[in-house]
Amino acid sequence: MLPPVPSRLGLLLLLLCPAHVDGLWWAVGSPLVMDPTSICRKARRLAGRQAELCQAEPEVVAELARGARLGVRECQFQFRFRRWNCSSHSKAFGRVLQQDIRETAFVFAITAAGASHAVTQACSMGELLQCGCQAPRGRAPPRPSGLLGTPGPPGPTGSPDASAAWEWGGCGDDVDFGDEKSRLFMDAQHKRGRGDIRALVQLHNNEAGRLAVRSHTRTECKCHGLSGSCALRTCWQKLPPFREVGARLLERFHGASRVMGTNDGKALLPAVRTLKPPGRADLLYAADSPDFCAPNRRTGSPGTRGRACNSSAPDLSGCDLLCCGRGHRQESVQLEENCLCRFHWCCVVQCHRCRVRKELSLCL
């Protein structure tokens, strides 16, 4: 039986695979349940505000669950060449998340970001009744960062994209609403109690994930008018692609800061006193990661034996690093791939399935 896990782990399990929340791990190959009724039926362990959200806004909970899964898929993409590749296909994944290491910081940040991103996107698509497009009232004039269409004549300052020449319009992505729901559901169980360093670290990483979405939201603008007159100029806020969010958080993962708690347990300090305190966008961890080279039930390391590697690459995907110096073997395998693809009007791409033989390098 697994040891007690932090509340955030239980919540992630609930969001991603509610049918298996009692087992406290992410089940092998199980379908990820999207039905909010199933999620909330397993919500006995949720805090008051989470239970209220389940009861009052189950469709929002469904989007939060979709966003958490989006985050895990992005984690698997960004970590695909690392020794720990964010695989959720074993009980070991839950054991990894019980440690306050860099990898856990990334998982919590990317799932909080995914929850915010998914809810915000659902608002803009009209899929949630509780929200819609971003309200422009009381906001400063837009400063375009991306133009669609032909820019019009110069504005008051001599530039076609001068702020006074543009107005808010279109359907902007309401990141405020997405952040609010992500924060309400993902942060609710954490208590900033005395000595609870883990809660402080996880709350910080949650917020860093949401900030990665918000801070890379861009302003897109478009000119409207006959013959390129640009009689009307409108701008709206646009979410960044989630792949971009993942890439930004991976950069933060590489530069993550190790921290420790203050004596009263109410704040965090750099583990190395000579370093400056981490910023809001930084990821935090409190313990060193295992090397993930060999299987280890205690740490959740699945090891790298049998992993495909690149025999000629000097980076993380290379056999030297991925195989931890154990060497690798060559194996010839037969795979099926799409081939002879043709576009048929309109609008279908049809492909044949071809068998190809490839040489793979596999870790010993």
From Swiss-Prot:
<dbReference type="InterPro" id="IPR005817">
    <property type="entry name" value="Wnt"/>
</dbReference>
<feature type="glycosylation site" description="N-linked (GlcNAc...) asparagine">
    <location>
        <position position="85"/>
    </location>
</feature>
<feature type="region of interest" description="Disordered">
    <location>
        <begin position="140"/>
        <end position="162"/>
    </location>
</feature>
<keyword id="KW-0449">Lipoprotein</keyword>
<dbReference type="GO" id="GO:0016055">
    <property type="term" value="P:Wnt signaling pathway"/>
</dbReference>
<feature type="disulfide bond">
    <location>
        <begin position="323"/>
        <end position="363"/>
    </location>
</feature>
<keyword id="KW-0272">Extracellular matrix</keyword>
<feature type="glycosylation site" description="N-linked (GlcNAc...) asparagine">
    <location>
        <position position="310"/>
    </location>
</feature>
<dbReference type="Pfam" id="PF00110">
    <property type="entry name" value="wnt"/>
</dbReference>
<feature type="disulfide bond">
    <location>
        <begin position="75"/>
        <end position="86"/>
    </location>
</feature>
<dbReference type="GO" id="GO:0042475">
    <property type="term" value="P:odontogenesis of dentin-containing tooth"/>
</dbReference>
<dbReference type="GO" id="GO:0072079">
    <property type="term" value="P:nephron tubule formation"/>
</dbReference>
<dbReference type="InterPro" id="IPR009143">
    <property type="entry name" value="Wnt6"/>
</dbReference>
<dbReference type="GO" id="GO:0072080">
    <property type="term" value="P:nephron tubule development"/>
</dbReference>
<feature type="disulfide bond">
    <location>
        <begin position="339"/>
        <end position="354"/>
    </location>
</feature>
<dbReference type="GO" id="GO:0005788">
    <property type="term" value="C:endoplasmic reticulum lumen"/>
</dbReference>
<feature type="signal peptide">
    <location>
        <begin position="1"/>
        <end position="23"/>
    </location>
</feature>
<dbReference type="InterPro" id="IPR018161">
    <property type="entry name" value="Wnt_CS"/>
</dbReference>
<feature type="disulfide bond">
    <location>
        <begin position="309"/>
        <end position="319"/>
    </location>
</feature>
<keyword id="KW-0217">Developmental protein</keyword>
<dbReference type="GO" id="GO:0005102">
    <property type="term" value="F:signaling receptor binding"/>
</dbReference>
<feature type="disulfide bond">
    <location>
        <begin position="133"/>
        <end position="171"/>
    </location>
</feature>
<feature type="disulfide bond">
    <location>
        <begin position="223"/>
        <end position="230"/>
    </location>
</feature>
<feature type="disulfide bond">
    <location>
        <begin position="341"/>
        <end position="351"/>
    </location>
</feature>
<dbReference type="GO" id="GO:0009798">
    <property type="term" value="P:axis specification"/>
</dbReference>
<comment type="similarity">
    <text>Belongs to the Wnt family.</text>
</comment>
<feature type="disulfide bond">
    <location>
        <begin position="346"/>
        <end position="347"/>
    </location>
</feature>
<feature type="disulfide bond">
    <location>
        <begin position="123"/>
        <end position="131"/>
    </location>
</feature>
<keyword id="KW-0325">Glycoprotein</keyword>
<dbReference type="GO" id="GO:0009986">
    <property type="term" value="C:cell surface"/>
</dbReference>
<feature type="disulfide bond">
    <location>
        <begin position="221"/>
        <end position="235"/>
    </location>
</feature>
<keyword id="KW-0879">Wnt signaling pathway</keyword>
<protein>
    <recommendedName>
        <fullName>Protein Wnt-6</fullName>
    </recommendedName>
</protein>
<dbReference type="GO" id="GO:0031012">
    <property type="term" value="C:extracellular matrix"/>
</dbReference>
<comment type="subunit">
    <text>Interacts with PORCN.</text>
</comment>
<keyword id="KW-0732">Signal</keyword>
<dbReference type="GO" id="GO:0007267">
    <property type="term" value="P:cell-cell signaling"/>
</dbReference>
<feature type="disulfide bond">
    <location>
        <begin position="293"/>
        <end position="324"/>
    </location>
</feature>
<feature type="lipid moiety-binding region" description="O-palmitoleoyl serine; by PORCN">
    <location>
        <position position="227"/>
    </location>
</feature>
<dbReference type="GO" id="GO:0009887">
    <property type="term" value="P:animal organ morphogenesis"/>
</dbReference>
<dbReference type="GO" id="GO:0045893">
    <property type="term" value="P:positive regulation of DNA-templated transcription"/>
</dbReference>
<dbReference type="GO" id="GO:0005576">
    <property type="term" value="C:extracellular region"/>
</dbReference>
